[in-house]
Every structure is written in structure tokens, then in C-alpha cells.
UniProtKB/Swiss-Prot annotation:
One of the record's GO cellular component terms: mitochondrial inner membrane
Note in the entry: Heme 1 (or BL or b562) is low-potential and absorbs at about 562 nm, and heme 2 (or BH or b566) is high-potential and absorbs at about 566 nm.
GO biological process: mitochondrial electron transport, ubiquinol to cytochrome c
Subunit note: The cytochrome bc1 complex contains 11 subunits: 3 respiratory subunits (MT-CYB, CYC1 and UQCRFS1), 2 core proteins (UQCRC1 and UQCRC2) and 6 low-molecular weight proteins (UQCRH/QCR6, UQCRB/QCR7, UQCRQ/QCR8, UQCR10/QCR9, UQCR11/QCR10 and a cleavage product of UQCRFS1). This cytochrome bc1 complex then forms a dimer.
Underlying gene: MT-CYB
Official protein name in the record: Cytochrome b
InterPro entries in the cross-refs: Cyt_b/b6_C (IPR005798), Cyt_b/b6_C_sf (IPR036150), Cyt_b/b6_N (IPR005797), Cytb/b6-like_sf (IPR027387), Cytochrome_b (IPR030689), Cytochrome_b_C_euk/bac (IPR048260), Cytochrome_b_N_euk/bac (IPR048259), Di-haem_cyt_TM (IPR016174)
Topology term for the membrane: Multi-pass membrane protein
Keywords: Electron transport, Heme, Iron, Membrane, Metal-binding, Mitochondrion, Mitochondrion inner membrane, Respiratory chain, Transmembrane, Transmembrane helix, Transport, Ubiquinone
Transmembrane regions listed in the UniProt entry: 33-53, 77-98, 113-133, 178-198, 226-246, 288-308, 320-340, 347-367
Molecular-function GO terms, alphabetical: metal ion binding; ubiquinol-cytochrome-c reductase activity
Length: 379
């Protein structure tokens, strides 16, 4: 008798995606992050759902409702901190996942890569709107500063900002709509994930060597299910350690002060996972230029496939490209550090140099090194 998982219309889809999926035999732990991101999304949706049952999206009661969740709701504190720190875990996995794609040339699967970029934007938008919901000082001023950037758009800028605000400042209407979109977007993200996987399974997975592995495939289960479970245990250990021992480590103390439109915090900054983009934004003196650089800091990933000049897909056998890749990683750490510092000497100039280096590596140096390595291979 044929196994039900191979014949049932619904189970067949799951079977072909998780059980009998042919996978390259050489996948390393860098290929774990897709499943970890799926788990992160599930955790965020579940904790968010339970938080939404107790949260009120009204400027008068939002801050108090979060306090109520932490103090009075059964295990509300763990829900709140799992959700807040789960977002950090989400972004750690996201950035490692994108980094893996850049290193091993997975961007050559353009459909999968482009859906991935859309997913990255969607997750960033969701995280930004979620940060506004507790209605602390940094929530309010972060929302004001970031939405105000749209006023740099010529002609329609000011109208656009007031349309998003639902008034002449960040107020009740803004909070309500941000809550609505913050609730909606994860489900849209879930749908996009399905499309992401659909395109991935059209081409099959890449592997560390960048060489086609059609001749050497193994079933996803049990080999990679076990491997993914190990990654999951490590991630859950890290997340639960963070939540149970220092839940406010990655947060901002200013967010424990209720939002006050009359009092500006000394340093307005977003959560740590946006600091690199925030540093790029601040490093350009012109407002419109800064906004364009901010958007391009992520959108630049979309043109990476067009800039691939090497004859090899992966960087595994390309030491010069590897050096450049790790320079890019170091540069992103520098930008993240600069984004959290005040706007003064020497941080301004460091931020500007790091921003120029970021775009130079991706747009100029990587393609040039690829061409150079092609010539070196002829010797």
C-alpha cells in the first residue's frame, strides 16, 4: 500500500517540501536559517496573537495596557519579552540568511532572491510598526522621525506624511493604524514565504561549492530535519536565556517612559537591527539624499545578481572575494555601532566613510574582484 503522505493532496505538498525533498549532500549549518526563520515567524505570530488579546491601541491606554500585560496577565511578561526579543532573533537569523546568500552566490536564483528582498522589507516594516505600539518615548519619537523622512519626497512629501499620520502629528489615528498593519503584515509575510519556497523548489537548493549537485542528492528527512532541530535548539536556548536573564538588554530605557510630545529624548535611535541603515541615513547631510541612501542600503541587494562577474557561483574557492565579503561584514558592524552614537565628531566622519565603503564594496569592488579572479584562473 502506498504511504498516505505520498498520495493525500495536502500531505503530498508537505511531503515534497519537508520529507522526500532531494537536497544536496554537502549543505552546512548555514542552510539552517531558512527553517529557523520559519520558527521565528511562527513564534512571533503566536506570541503577538496573545499579546493583541490584552493590548489596547489607544494613546491614553496603550502604555498602561503593556504594563498590565507584564504585571497582571498570566505569563504576560514572558509573552511580551519573547515577542520583543524574538524580533531580535528574527533579524539575527535574517541577516545571517542574507549573508549566506551573498557568500555562496544563492542570489543567482533571482526569483527566490527578489522575493527574499520583498520579505526583508516587509519584516522591517512590521518591526518598525511594532516598536511604536508600547507608546513609550522612543516609540513616539522613533515614529515621528522615521515617518517624517517621507516629507523629503518632492511635491507630495508633506501630504503623504500627514496622510500616514492621520492628522498633523503622530497621534491616536497613527497608533491605531500601525497596530492594524502590524497585525496584518505577518500573515502577508507568511504568504510571501510560501512563494519564496515555491521558487526555491523550482530550482532546488544551492550548495557550498556552487557546483550543480543533481548527481549527489539525499532526502531532506532524516538528514536535514535532525540538523535543523539542532539549530532550533541552539536558537531557542539563546532566546530563552535572553528572555529569562536580561530581557531588556537590547531595548531602550527611554521606552519605559510614557510618550510625551513635549519632551524630546536626547538621542533618538531605532532598535539595534536598524542601526546600520540609520547610520547610512544620518551620514548624508541632505534629507532626500539620506532617505534615498536608506532605501538603497537594502534595495542594493536587488542588483547584486546583475553584478556577478565571476565564473564561479560560490565564494568557497575565491579567497580575494572572501576577504572583501568579511570586510563588508566588519563595515556593517561599524555602521551598527555608529548608528547608536550621537551625531558629533568623530562619529560623523566614521559613519560617512563606512557608508561609502558599504556601497563601494557591493557596487564596485565585488564585480572588479570577480573579473580579476577570472583572469587569475587562466594562469
Amino acid at each position: 500500500m502506498t504511504n498516505i503522505r505520498k498520495t493525500h493532496p495536502l500531505l503530498k505538498i508537505l511531503n515534497n517540501s519537508l520529507v522526500d525533498l532531494p537536497a544536496p549532500s554537502s549543505l552546512t549549518s548555514w542552510w539552517n536559517f531558512g527553517s529557523l526563520l520559519g520558527i521565528c515567524l511562527a513564534v512571533q505570530i503566536l506570541t503577538g496573537l496573545f499579546l493583541a488579546m490584552h493590548y489596547t491601541s489607544d494613546t491614553a491606554t496603550a502604555f498602561n495596557s503593556v504594563t498590565h500585560i507584564c504585571r497582571d496577565v498570566n505569563y504576560g511578561w514572558i509573552l511580551r519579552y519573547l515577542h520583543a526579543n524574538g524580533a531580535s532573533m528574527f533579524f539575527i537569523c535574517l541577516y545571517l540568511h542574507v549573508g549566506r546568500g551573498l557568500y555562496y552566490g544563492s542570489y543567482t536564483y533571482t526569483e527566490t532572491w527578489n522575493i527574499g528582498i520583498i520579505l526583508l522589507f516587509a519584516v522591517m516594516a512590521t518591526a518598525f510598526m511594532g516598536y511604536v505600539l508600547p507608546w513609550g518615548q522612543m516609540s513616539f519619537w522613533g515614529a515621528t522621525v522615521i515617518t517624517n523622512l517621507l516629507s523629503a519626497i518632492p511635491y507630495i512629501g508633506t501630504d503623504l506624511v500627514q496622510w500616514i499620520w492621520g492628522g498633523f502629528s503622530v497621534d491616536k489615528a497613527t497608533l491605531t493604524r500601525f497596530f492594524a498593519f502590524h497585525f496584518l503584515l505577518p500573515f502577508i509575510i507568511s504568504a510571501l514565504v510560501m512563494v519564496h519556497l515555491l521558487f526555491l523548489h523550482e530550482t532546488g537548493s544551492n550548495n557550498p561549492t556552487g557546483i550543480p549537485s543533481d548527481l549527489d542528492m539525499i532526502p531532506f528527512h532524516p538528514y536535514y530535519t535532525i540538523k535543523d532541530i539542532l539549530g532550533l535548539l541552539i536558537m531557542l536556548t539563546a532566546l530563552s536565556t535572553l528572555v529569562l536573564f536580561s530581557p531588556d538588554l537590547l531595548g531602550d530605557p527611554d521606552n519605559y517612559t510614557p510618550a510625551n510630545p513635549l519632551n524630546t529624548p536626547p538621542h533618538i535611535k531605532p532598535e539595534w537591527y536598524f542601526l546600520f541603515a540609520y547610520a547610512i541615513l544620518r551620514s548624508i547631510p541632505n534629507k532626500l539624499g539620506g532617505v534615498l541612501a536608506l532605501v538603497l542600503s537594502i534595495l542594493v541587494l536587488a542588483i547584486v545578481p546583475m553584478l556577478h562577474t565571476s565564473k564561479q557561483q560560490s565564494m568557497m574557492f575565491r579567497p580575494l572575494s572572501q576577504c572583501l565579503f568579511w570586510l563588508l561584514v566588519a563595515d556593517l558592524f561599524t555602521l551598527t555601532w555608529i548608528g547608536g552614537q550621537p551625531v558629533e565628531y568623530p562619529y560623523i566622519i566614521i559613519g560617512q566613510v563606512a557608508s561609502i565603503l558599504y556601497f563601494s564594496i557591493i557596487l564596485i569592488l565585488m564585480p572588479l574582484i570577480g573579473i580579476m579572479e577570472n583572469h587569475l584562473l587562466k594562469w
